[in-house]
C-alpha cells in the first residue's frame, strides 16, 4: 500500500494554529517570531514549542477551542486527500500542531485521514496551563513515519512525505519521495520536488503514479 504523510500547519493548512491561539492571548508577535525561527531551523522544535506554549498560559480553554474550530484546509487539500484515499492510498498527518484543529479542518472539508499523530495544549480549570504534550514534542517525524508505514505494511522508502518546515526534514529525508510545499529556507534542499499549491502537488503525485 502506498502511504503519503502530510505535515499540517503550513502544508495542508496555510496558518499555524499556535500563532492564531497566541493572537487570542495578545502575544501573537512574540509567538510568530519563535515559530519562524523554529521553521528555519534556528531553534529546536521541542524548545520552541514549549516556549510558545508557555506564552499562552492562562488563555481560556474555550478561546483555544474556538481557534481549533476555525481551522480549515488550504484550497484543494480536501479534494486531494479524497482522491488519494479513493485510489487506495493511505493518508496520514504527522504534526507538531494540535489534533483538535486537524479534526475540525478535516470535518469541515468532509474528508478524513487514515491516521493523525499530533500534540495537545494542556488545560486545567478551564485555562491553558502553558504545558504541551504529545508524541511529536520530543519525538521526530521520521520515527512517526516509520511507525505509520509499519502499521500500513509498507516502508518509508516506498512512502511520500509532504512538508514545509525544519521539523519536517527528518521525515522528508526518511521518505522515498520528499515534496516541499513552499518550503522554508534550507528545507528545499531535502525535497525531491517543491510546489506552491495543492493542484501542483496533485500533478507531482500523478507523475509518480500515486494520485
UniProtKB/Swiss-Prot annotation:
Top-level taxon in the UniProt lineage: Archaea
- How are cofactors bound according to the entry's free-text note? Binds 1 Mg(2+) ion per subunit.
User: What's this chain's function?
Assistant: Catalyzes the dephosphorylation of phosphoserine (P-Ser).
Q: Which gene encodes it?
A: serB
UniProt note: phenotype after gene disruption = Strong increase of Ser protein phosphorylation.
What is this protein called in UniProt? Phosphoserine phosphatase
For this protein, the record's PANTHER family field holds: PHOSPHOSERINE PHOSPHATASE
Q: Which family does it belong to?
A: Belongs to the HAD-like hydrolase superfamily. SerB family.
Q: Where is the active site?
A: 7 (nucleophile), 9 (proton donor)
Amino acid at each position: 500500500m502506498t502511504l503519503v504523510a502530510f505535515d499540517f500547519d503550513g502544508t495542508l493548512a496555510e496558518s499555524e494554529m499556535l500563532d492564531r491561539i497566541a493572537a487570542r492571548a495578545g502575544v501573537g508577535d512574540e509567538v510568530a517570531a519563535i515559530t519562524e525561527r523554529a521553521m528555519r531551523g534556528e531553534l529546536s522544535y521541542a524548545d520552541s514549542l514549549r516556549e510558545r506554549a508557555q506564552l499562552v498560559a492562562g488563555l481560556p480553554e474555550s478561546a483555544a477551542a474556538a481557534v481549533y474550530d476555525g481551522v480549515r484546509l488550504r484550497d484543494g487539500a480536501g479534494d486531494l486527500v479524497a482522491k488519494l484515499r479513493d485510489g487506495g492510498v493511505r493518508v496520514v498527518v504527522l504534526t507538531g500542531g494540535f489534533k483538535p484543529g486537524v479534526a475540525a479542518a478535516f470535518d469541515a472539508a468532509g474528508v478524513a485521514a487514515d491516521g493523525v499523530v499530533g500534540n495537545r495544549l494542556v488545560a486545567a480549570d478551564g485555562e491553558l496551563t502553558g504545558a504541551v504534550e504529545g508524541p511529536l514534542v520530543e519525538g521526530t517525524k521520521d520515527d512517526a513515519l516509520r511507525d505509520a508505514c509499519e502499521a500500513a505494511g509498507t516502508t518509508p522508502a516506498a512512502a511520500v512525505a509532504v512538508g514545509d518546515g525544519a521539523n519536517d526534514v527528518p521525515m522528508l529525508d526518511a521518505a522515498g519521495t520528499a515534496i516541499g510545499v513552499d518550503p522554508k529556507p534550507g528545507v528545499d534542499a531535502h525535497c525531491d520536488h517543491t510546489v506552491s499549491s495543492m493542484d501542483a502537488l496533485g500533478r507531482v503525485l500523478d507523475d509518480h503514479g500515486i494520485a
